[in-house]
């Protein structure tokens, strides 16, 4: 795991292969695993109401909605793939803090 500053320009996770993707969001208060249509993905900052994470359906990318935040990134690599039925999913984990809350976001993609 490495730590880096993520900007809007830097963080764009392609998801061309799946009409639905799973986003696993952890916070101290809750954890949720849901399947969203791409245009339904939207997590808001509790204090500002600014979207933290959204899906750009026109460009099929996921972007973190912050100009610059510190995030520890565990990229998708061979070995962190999950078989599910006939498909295999890879995932990338982004750990970051915003508004004093720690978040861990796992973005699953069909490979």
Walk through the language-model features, giving the residues of each.
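N-terminal glycine/threonine-rich, aromatic-flanked beta-hairpin/loop signature
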Residues: 23, 30-57
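Low-complexity, intrinsically disordered Gly/Pro/Thr-rich segments
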Residues: 80-96
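Charged, amphipathic alpha-helical segments
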Residues: 1-9, 35-38, 70-81
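Glycine-centered tight beta-turn/hairpin loop motif at sheet-sheet or coil-to-beta transitions
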Residues: 29, 57-61, 98-102
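Structured surface patches comprising rigid loops and adjacent beta-strands/short helices at the edges
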Residues: 41-44, 60-80, 110
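Short beta-strand segments that buttress and anchor functional surface loops
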Residues: 25, 55-57, 93-97
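Long, hydrophobic N-terminal alpha-helical segment
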Residues: 1-33
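Edge beta-strand at a domain terminus
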Residues: 95-111
